From Swiss-Prot:
Keyword entries, A-Z: Cell inner membrane, Cell membrane, Cell shape, Cell wall biogenesis/degradation, Glycosyltransferase, Membrane, Peptidoglycan synthesis, Transferase, Transmembrane, Transmembrane helix
Pathway given in the UniProt record: Cell wall biogenesis; peptidoglycan biosynthesis
Localization of this protein: Cell inner membrane
InterPro entries: Glyco_trans_51 (IPR001264), Lysozyme-like_dom_sf (IPR023346), PBP_transglycosylase (IPR036950), Pep_trsgly (IPR011812)
Protein name in the entry: Biosynthetic peptidoglycan transglycosylase
Species whose genome carries this gene: Yersinia enterocolitica serotype O:8 / biotype 1B (strain NCTC 13174 / 8081)
Leader sequence segment: none
GO cellular component labels: peptidoglycan-based cell wall; plasma membrane
Record-level GO BP terms: cell wall organization; peptidoglycan biosynthetic process; regulation of cell shape
Gene3D superfamilies reported for this sequence: Biosynthetic peptidoglycan transglycosylase-like
Molecular functions per Gene Ontology: pentosyltransferase activity; peptidoglycan glycosyltransferase activity
Gene that specifies this protein: mtgA
Amino acid sequence: MISVRRGLNWLWYWGKRAVIGIVALWLAGILIFAFLPVPFSMVMIERQLGAWLTGDFSYVAHSDWVPMDEISPYMALAVMAAEDQKFPEHWGFDVGAIESALAHNQRNQNRIRGASTLSQQTAKNLFLWDGRSWVRKGLEVGLTAGIELVWTKRRILTVYLNIAEFGDGIFGVEAAARHFFNKPASKLSASEAALLAAVLPNPLRFKANAPSGYVISRQQWILRQMRQLGGKDFIQANDLD
C-alpha cells in the first residue's frame, strides 16, 4: 500500500513539473515568435517523425521563412477569404461561425464542419498535434488567447502563411509558390493564391498541381470572395500588408 502511494506521489510530482515545463515552453514560444522567424512547427515535427517511423527517410518537411513584405497581398487575402473573413475584427474566435458549425454538425453528423479561425489554426499548427480531441481543443483555446494578446494581426497572418501545410512535405507559402509555380511568394497572382488557399482544408488529399473539380470550384469561390471583400484594399485598410 505504501509503495503504491509512493508511486502515485512520484507520478504527481513529476507530472506536475512536466505540465509546468510544457506551459513555460508555450509561453516562451509565444513571446519569442512574436519577433523571430519560426524555424519549425509541431505539425512539421509530427509529419517528419511519422515519415521516419514508417521507414520513409527521404521525406523532408520543408519551409522557407519570408516576411509579410515578401508575400503577395493576394495570398493573405485568399486565406482570409477562404478560412476566416472576420479575421481583422475578432479576438481569436468567431462566435457566429462556431454557433453555425454546431448547428450544422447536429443536423449532419457524418459531415463535420469546423469553425477555427486563422488564429486558432496558427496556434494548433505551431504548438499542438494534429487530430480532433477535446483536450487539444481546450489547449488550442488557451494558446489562441495568448497569441491574440501578444501578437499583432499582421504577425499572426505572417506566421500562419509560413507554417501552413500546402502539400506533402511543403510548408509555408514560399516553399509552395516555388514548388507549384516556380516563383517566389511575392509574385503569386490572385488565381494562384486562391488555388493554394483552396487546398488548405486537406493539403494531403487536395493537390494544387493536379486540382480536382472540387478544388477548382473552391478556387473560383475564393476568387469571388476576394473581390467581395474589396481586393487588395481590404489588406491595406486593415494594416495587414
